């Protein structure tokens, strides 16, 4: 019995010293949003770059200066804030700047954006992603 207590008494400090002291650093996890996939960009390498390129082409192709606003020399910068929703559709959140006619044209242009082939993603789940697009209306007169 004395031998058991003696072995236990000797091994106790070994257990105590075998534990390491240290600090646990926080793990920082950064999750990157993945842009929605514009129709036709499914096979492209970078969905984000393709989305930006297709959005710029869409805006340029569908841009129209409202005739009455042009005639009245209405100019200004209109900023449209919108979301591409989890279902891949456009949801306008805010329109500011410019005149009412210029705002309506900017809204019309953005609402013509097609439904995305895939929505934006965050951590592997569909995520609504916010975009802000400026429209500069100048008549050059």
Predicted ranges, named:
Residues 5-7, 17-141:
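Charge-biased low-complexity segments
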Residues 11-15:
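N-terminal signal peptide c-region/cleavage motif recognized by signal peptidases
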């Amino acid at each position: 019995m004395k031998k058991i207590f003696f072995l236990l008494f000797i091994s106790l400090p070994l257990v105590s010293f075998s534990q390491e002291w240290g600090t646990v650093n926080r793990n920082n996890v950064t999750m990157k949003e993945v842009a929605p996939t514009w129709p036709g960009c499914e096979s492209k390498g970078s969905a984000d770059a393709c989305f930006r390129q297709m959005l710029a082409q869409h805006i340029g192709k569908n841009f129209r200066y409202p005739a009455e606003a042009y005639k009245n020399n209405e100019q200004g910068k209109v900023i449209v804030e919108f979301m591409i929703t989890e279902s891949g559709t456009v949801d306008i959140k805010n329109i500011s700047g410019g005149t009412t006619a210029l705002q309506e044209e900017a809204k019309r242009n953005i609402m013509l954006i097609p439904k995305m082939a895939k929505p934006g993603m965050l951590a592997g789940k569909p995520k609504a992603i916010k975009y802000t697009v400026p429209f500069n209306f100048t008549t050059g007169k």
